[in-house]
Amino acid sequence: MKNSQKTVTVKFNADASTGQANLQVDTAVQKVANGKDAFTLTATVEDKNGNPVPGTLVTFNLPRGVKPLTGDNVWVKANDEGKAELQVVSVTAGTYEITASAGNDQPSDAQTITFVADKATATVSGIEVIGNYALADGKAKQTYKVTVTDANNNLLKDSEVTLTASPASLNLEPNGTATTNEQGQAIFTATTTVAATYTLTAQVSQNNGQVSTKTAEAKFVADDKNAVLAASSDVTSLVADGVQTATMTVTLFSANNPVGGNVWVDIEAPEGVTEKGYQFLPSKNDHFVSGKITRTFSTSKPGVYTFTFNALTYGGYEMKPVTVTITAVDADTAKGEEAMK
């Protein structure tokens, strides 16, 4: 046969044994660590001559905290273009390194992906009170650290936290809102001149319009070291008839704050007068609850009575004693003076 020709088709396959995976990640800078928002990983497999290697099994090397969107399989077969894809998610915020490997078992260059906390589920997880029982002197400070996390306990940065206090006599700085830092904490400080137990309420908004709140207690106490004991009587003299009374008021305050403590009185009666000759009610010893006590005095024995009040604060500070003097006038003398008017 003259001029006979025959065509033969020859197929060259890529060298799968030299297949090298090159890893790429979608262009998203970060995803939310909610177990749903996924990065797409694409591994392209080529042999040493740059030919795509379809059908090669690609292994995506995922670190702890990162997993496939569906199932647990990290092995994906490359398509006709030598590409394998895997979507991955996380519930733990952080930056992770991922590699892929194929036929030659050599890992690709590492790519990083970042998952961030989920603002949609922002929650006030705690309020730390530092410096509790500070003095209510307008200078001593307390610090409040409000921690915000998401539904998966990831610390939330850049969340606006509102803090209020009741009663409202607490001076907060900043007054209203603070933004959480890298540790998920919004930090406030406070001073006051009003000793009280304050209820702190922290609030953070979620994307669905809901809010998360949490409360804590903080106590400012009176400065009992600088407390002042005072005593007075509604009268300076009375008739020694056993009926008329004098009412004495005794106070223990630091600035405008009541101070707790024990109080007792020493009574100096006229010569010859025993305790049976007068009444001091209800008792000579007591304790301050709200910074104030009252006592009544009456007598049937004339003369000058001196009452010396002493106090010891619950903090262990002894106060400077104060005195009240009352003159009891003989009943007959009082009647004569009244008749002469």
Where are these regions (language model features)?
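The feature marks long extracellular or luminal low-complexity segments
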Residues: 1-341
